[in-house]
Structures are given as C-alpha cells and as structure tokens.
C-alpha cells in the first residue's frame, strides 16, 4: 500500500454496516481525486454506491419517475443495475450537482432514480464525513453534490439547503441534499395540481387506500405541503396552497378536512377541521414569516395570519385549557396522540400573547397522556407503540372517529406511526427530556426489529398485525412508518445504523408502497429532518 492510499468510510444500507474501502489509486498509476472531482461516483477498486457518493452502483427506479443511470463505472466497468465493476483505479463519470445521484438527470414531470446499494463499483471520496478527499487532475470534473448552507438570497433567510445539524441528534453518514430535492420534485409532480384548486394549487390524493373520494384534498395534505414548500424555499407554491385553504373554510374559520376533487366543497363527511392540519399550517406560516417576511402574494402578512391561526387553534381545538382536541367539538375522550406537536406549542407560547392562552399547559398535559398510554394493560410499556386514539387516561378508544383505512384505532397504525417524528423534534430542538425518554422506547423497539423487517401495523404489544405477518403485506415498508421511526432514532448515537438504514430505504423509493400522497409526504418531511434542513424557528 502506498502513501497516497486513502481509507474511506462508506455506509452500505443493504449490509447495515460501515465498510472501510481502501483506495489504492497511486499504485494503479493514477493520482487521487480532488473533492470537486469526487462527485456522483468516482470509479475505483472497491465499495458500493449510495446516493451518488460511490460510483458504479445500481440505479433504482423511483415511483412516478424515470430511472437514473447510476454512477458511471471506471475504465472497463459497466454502470447500471446491480453495480458495475470498475477497473482498479478507474475514474467514473459521476453526476452533476443538480442531478440525482450517479448522474441521473431530472426530467419535467418526473425524477430520475437515485443510486441504491451498489455492487463492486469504485469508491468515491465525495460525501464522506470523516475522510479528507485526495487530489487528482481530470479534464472535465463534475461539481460535487451540494452540502452545507446555501448563501443567503435577497429576501430569503434560509434558502434550501442549510444542513444545520443539531448537536443533540445524529444524522445519516452519507446524506445528500440532492436526495431531498429529488423526493420533493417527485411529491410535487405526483400530488400537486391546479385542477379543482379554485385558481390556485392543491395537494391531491391520487391513489390512497380507504373510502375517501379519489383525488380529493385533505387539510392535512395542505399542511404537509406548506411545511415542505417553506423549507424548500418554494414561495409560489406555499402561497397557492394557503389561498386554496382559504377557499374552503368551515364553521370555525378553519379548513374543512376533506374537499372534493372538483373544489366544489367538502366531501360527504368532510366538514369540520382537523387539528393536526391546522397546527402544521400555523407553524408553516411562522416559518414563512421567518423565511421570506412580509406577505408574498397574500393579502396579509404571514405573521398576522399565523397569529390568527393560533387564536383559532386555541379557541376551537384545545379542550378545558389543556387537552388537545382532535377536531372542534371533541373532548378528552377522543385524543389522537399523533396530533401532539410539543415543539410547535413551545414556539406558539412565545408568540401568542393572548392572556387566556397557555400552550405550556397543553404541552405538560399531553405528555402526561402520552406516558399514560404506555401501560401494562396495553402491553406497550417498553416499546412506545401508542394507540391511534385514546382517552385522557391513555385507554384506547375503539369507537373513536377516524379509525383509518380499516386499521383499528387501538393499534399502532397509519396515525400513530407519526408520533416519533413529532416527539423527536422536541428533543432535537428543545432538549426536552420527556421527548428523549419516549423516543428511546420506539427506537429500541424498531432497532431490534431492523428497518428491513418493519411492517405497517402492530398490536400495542409489538406483534405485527395479522395481515402483515404473511404474504405480500409482510413485505410492505412504507415511508410513513420508516421515516418517522428514523427521525425518532436520531436522538441517540446508539441507533446510528438504524438511522442510516432508514435513510437508505427512503432514498431508494422502496418505501413508496402505499398511497402516493401520504407516503411521499412523509418521505420528504423525514428526509428534510434527516439532512438537517427541517430547521428550528428559534435557532435561525
């Protein structure tokens, strides 16, 4: 081994381990590559591909997009599915900074595939966190994948990307901003439409399971869309989504939760607000004020609108000054713990100066309910698997509204799977020890299962629900489960490998197996958090 050989730490999601790839480039008669030339896939003698960091890996087709080319193999090697084998020391072509990993290009109406776990292609020095890249001369080097804060734009406070890591949390070893951009493009292409949007744009549900009208819009989707748009610096879409929301206000001045595809009004049973949607919109409006200031194309300033939303939330969706209602008119017998967003409420408490508002009391009360739901009767004291619906004592409420897609509200299902994300934010942003204690339970449970064996539904005791034990459903891995579980696991370095694995599955598109709208939404939101782009308002 020569002095110019380098040791590169590479994460391979299929193995779930860190590999040490030795780049003996000088011994093959080549100078080592520079950082600017190590983008997208330098072909060499060892290693697999992940996210464009390692050349010669396999390209994976994203749902709704076109397959990318993968990293180009070195001399004598072949790129493409399965991992092309490059000749020792060969230099691969790589991808451009605005392309998906491995040189796939974005196309209008879709996205190219991201490089998945590769075969024997060459290792690249791009995107490593612990190794400084060597030097090489190449005629036309591709630019490296973007990493680190984007310089401030005029009137924009935190343009994408930022990569502002929080010291309380761990992050995937090889995260890439290109992965987030690709996921966002795909979500936008598949779910955002002007059809039936009253002159603006909306988020549709093109193929969601269940009984809701096809292509309808749920207020939850508008909330998710506003969150994504503000962090991706997409002001035009943000404003359109909000203006669509304003066209569909219900009895309490809050958006009805399910709107017909043609925009003519709420669906049958779609009247009334949903608390999780309203709080996501409120937080997104606060972030819009921080991001852009002013009012954009809206009639009022973002901050003033957010304050109005906080008032609507407090007056209609808080019960007895301390319990989180699931919708206006509900009481403490029908609590959805996946609506509990303590990190938001701590921010609301700093901005909402209304004398009757006490967001701190809501935080404290709802943490008490969350902990009460983990008990010996439920069999979940050690795993953190909360029921979708419960009462204030933590007892599952099987008769609650919104059981969801045939899933019993007494199970850990498509509502409750979001809890580790919302609670994980409170640890990462605020150092809340109650949050840390909770996500320690879910992280230990899912880490013991492994990402590869996670399914889309569990009894509260941790047993996979019957329909997920055998057959095709036993292979289901949706991003709505994997993404939030991965975000929760960011709370402890013990679960670094689980975080890496979760990220690896999200970026391959393997987790897009359920409905397009819900899974793609949680893919983007989780990737934003995992790449340190889902920022804390108070830290900006």
Where does each model-flagged region fall?
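Internal amphipathic alpha-helical repeat/solenoid segments
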Residues: 170-221, 229-270
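N-terminal secretory signal peptides that target proteins for export/translocation
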Residues: 1-11
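Extended ligand-binding clefts on enzyme/binding-domain cores
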Residues: 145-183, 189, 215-219, 270-276, ...
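Bacterial N-terminal signal peptides
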Residues: 13-27
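Solenoid-repeat scaffolds in large eukaryotic assemblies
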Residues: 225, 234-238, 299, 306, ...
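A cross-kingdom marker for long, charged
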Residues: 472-476, 486-540
């Amino acid at each position: 081994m020569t002095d110019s050989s380098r040791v590169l730490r590479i994460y391979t999601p299929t193995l779930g381990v860190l590999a040490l790839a030795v780049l003996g480039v000088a011994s093959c008669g080549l100078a080592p590559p520079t950082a600017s030339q190590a983008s997208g896939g330098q072909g060499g003698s060892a290693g697999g591909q992940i996210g464009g960091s390692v050349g010669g890996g396999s390209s994976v087709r994203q749902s709704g997009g076109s397959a990318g080319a993968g990293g180009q193999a070195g001399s004598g090697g072949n790129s493409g599915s399965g991992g092309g084998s490059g000749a020792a020391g060969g230099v691969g072509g790589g991808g451009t900074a605005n392309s998906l990993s491995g040189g796939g290009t974005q196309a209008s109406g879709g996205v190219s595939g991201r490089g998945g776990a590769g075969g024997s292609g060459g290792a690249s020095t791009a995107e490593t966190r612990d190794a400084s890249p060597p030097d090489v001369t190449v005629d036309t080097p591709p630019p490296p994948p973007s990493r680190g804060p984007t310089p401030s734009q005029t009137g924009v406070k935190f343009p994408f990307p930022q990569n502002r890591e929080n010291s309380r949390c761990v992050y995937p070893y090889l995260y890439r901003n290109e992965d987030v951009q690709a996921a966002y493009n795909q979500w936008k292409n598949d779910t955002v439409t002007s059809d039936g949007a009253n002159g603006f744009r909306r988020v549709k549900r093109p193929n969601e399971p269940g009984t809701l009208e096809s292509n309808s819009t749920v207020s939850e989707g508008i909330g998710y869309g506003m969150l994504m748009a503000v962090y991706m610096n997409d002001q035009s879409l943000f404003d359109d989504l909000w203006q669509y929301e304003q066209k569909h206000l219900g009895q309490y001045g809050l958006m009805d939760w399910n709107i017909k595809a043609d925009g003519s009004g709420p669906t049958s049973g779609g009247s009334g607000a949903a608390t999780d949607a309203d709080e996501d919109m409120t937080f997104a409006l606060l972030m819009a004020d921080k991001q852009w200031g002013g009012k954009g194309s809206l009639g009022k300033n973002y901050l003033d609108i957010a304050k109005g939303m906080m008032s609507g939330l407090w007056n209609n969706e808080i019960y007895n000054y301390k319990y989180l209602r699931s919708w206006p008119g509900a009481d403490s017998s029908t609590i959805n713990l996946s609506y509990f967003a303590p990190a938001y409420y701590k921010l609301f408490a700093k901005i909402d100066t209304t004398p009757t508002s006490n967001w701190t009391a809501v935080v404290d009360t709802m943490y008490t309910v969350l902990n009460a739901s983990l008990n010996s009767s439920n069999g979940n004291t050690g795993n953190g698997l909360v029921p979708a619906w419960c009462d204030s004592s933590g007892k599952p409420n099987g008769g609650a509204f919104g059981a969801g897609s045939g899933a019993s509200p007494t199970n850990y299902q498509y509502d409750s799977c979001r809890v580790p994300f919302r609670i994980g934010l409170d640890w990462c942003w605020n150092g809340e020890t109650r949050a840390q204690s909770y996500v320690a339970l879910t992280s230990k449970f899912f880490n013991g299962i492994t990402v590869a064996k996670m399914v889309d539904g569990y009894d509260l005791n941790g047993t996979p629900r019957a329909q997920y034990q055998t057959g095709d459903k036993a292979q289901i891995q949706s991003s709505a489960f994997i993404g939030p579980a991965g975000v929760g696991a960011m709370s402890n370095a013990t679960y670094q490998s689980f975080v890496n694995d979760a990220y690896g599955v999200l970026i391959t598109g393997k987790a897009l197996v359920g409905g397009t709208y819900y899974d793609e939404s949680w893919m983007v939101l989780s990737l934003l958090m995992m790449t340190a782009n889902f920022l804390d308002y108070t830290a900006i």
